[in-house]
Design a protein with these regions (language model features):
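N-terminal beta1-alpha1-beta2 submodule of the flavodoxin-like/Rossmannoid cofactor-binding fold
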Residues: 1-58, 117-143
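Mobile beta-alpha loop/short-helix "lid" or hinge segments that flank ligand
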Residues: 1-10, 61-63, 95-114
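Short, surface-exposed connector motifs at secondary-structure boundaries
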Residues: 37-38, 65-69
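A glycine- and small-aliphatic-rich helix-loop capping segment at beta-alpha/alpha-beta transitions
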Residues: 55-63, 89-93
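Short, glycine-/small-residue-rich phosphate/pyrophosphate-handling segment
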Residues: 68-107, 118-125
């Protein structure tokens, strides 16, 4: 799901169930409450993740015992490391469980095409490791 596809005003009230959501937000509320796990993908902006991502989880804050994968990217050498650290704080604050293995993508334009296709095949191992570890955590938390 792409947060940009949904037009959330800045937080007006926390949504505690799909039924409590305004009609136009009920489809995303059902997805958020029904999700068993999340992978958060964001570019780094000014040392943190996007405001749209923060606003989404402000609307739907309680994600107890759900696995979270963190993927950050930047054109620079650090690959969104500062944003990843901020996301770990967010995950903790909404009672999620962060996968210790994150996918940090430095020089993103050299690793992925604009359509998301992996173009640096040497980076495939990092993607595979992240995916395997996140799936392991998500499966364990679901029991």
């Amino acid at each position: 799901m792409d947060v940009r596809d949904w037009h959330f005003p800045l937080l007006q009230e926390v949504i505690s169930s799909p039924e409590a959501a305004p009609e136009h937000l009920q489809p995303i509320a059902k997805r958020m409450f029904g999700a068993q796990a999340f992978i958060l993908v964001t570019p780094e902006y000014n040392g943190t993740y996007t405001a749209a991502l923060k606003n989404l989880f402000d609307y739907f804050p309680k994600q107890s015992h759900k696995a979270f994968g963190v993927v950050t990217a930047s054109p620079g050498a650090m690959g969104g490391m500062r944003a990843s650290q901020q996301l770990l704080l967010l995950v903790s604050g909404i009672f999620g469980v962060a996968c210790p293995n994150m996918l940090i993508v430095p020089g993103v334009e050299k690793k992925f095409a604009p359509d998301g296709e992996l173009i640096d095949l040497g980076y495939a191992k990092a993607v595979e490791t992240f995916t395997r570890e996140w799936l392991w955590l998500a499966e364990r938390l679901q029991g």
